[in-house]
Design a protein with these regions (language model features):
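Gram-negative bacterial Sec-dependent N-terminal signal peptides
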Residues: 1-20
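Mature extracellular/passenger domains of Gram-negative fimbrial/pilin and adhesin proteins
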Residues: 19-190
Length: 190
């Protein structure tokens, strides 16, 4: 009898399910000072059709090159904190909706069409100040689009940008095909 109970308890301990705890990390950032935004042409930007030969130059993702498509972001309905006309820092952050940038670059938004053009993505430049045009992302991928603006000028303000296609690896050829990239824009001020 002793042997049967021992054997049954051993069988049950081996076949019973094991439950292990798992952690879930949830992160959020809540701000009082957000704004609504509008993007020209409802955020649809058509870069047109270009030939693969148009990518032969040595234009980097860091350098602004005229000829891209311009678009405007309008900032409105900002919940202004405090009173008076004070200097604010307006942040307009661009990030890939998929979370994936072009391989080897933190400044080039990837082509999301896997069957599409290869070795080409999209870059976005701030052209608000023609004397100071810059890629909205630094070489490390952090946002550079921070603008000083007075409280009185914040609501209904417009900000100019330009976007174009960008060769990713200068040593490789661009291949033909469609290009699509979804970019999320976050706007806040401090």
């Amino acid at each position: 009898m002793k042997k049967s109970i021992l054997l049954l308890s051993l069988l049950f301990s081996v076949t019973s399910p094991v439950v292990a705890g798992q952690d879930v990390d949830i992160v959020a950032n809540i701000k009082n000072n957000t704004c609504q935004s509008g993007i020209s042409n409802n955020g649809n930007i058509d870069l047109g059709v270009v030939g693969v030969g148009d990518f032969t130059g040595n234009i980097s993702a860091e350098n602004y090159h005229p000829g891209g498509k311009e678009f405007t972001i309008t900032v409105q309905d900002c919940t202004l904190q405090g009173t008076g006309n004070v200097l604010n820092q307006l942040h307009i952050n661009f990030r890939a909706l998929s979370g994936v940038m072009a391989t080897g670059s933190s400044q080039i938004f990837a082509n999301e069409d896997n069957a599409g053009a290869k070795n080409v993505g999209v870059v976005i430049f701030s052209i608000q100040d023609p004397a100071n045009t810059f890629n909205v992302l630094s070489a490390t991928g952090s946002s550079r689009s921070v603008y000083p603006v007075m409280s009185s000028a914040l609501n209904n303000s417009s900000w100019k940008f330009s976007t174009r296609m960008q060769k990713i690896d200068p040593a490789l050829n661009v291949t033909s095909g469609p290009l699509i990239s979804h970019v999320l824009v976050d706007i806040y001020y401090e």
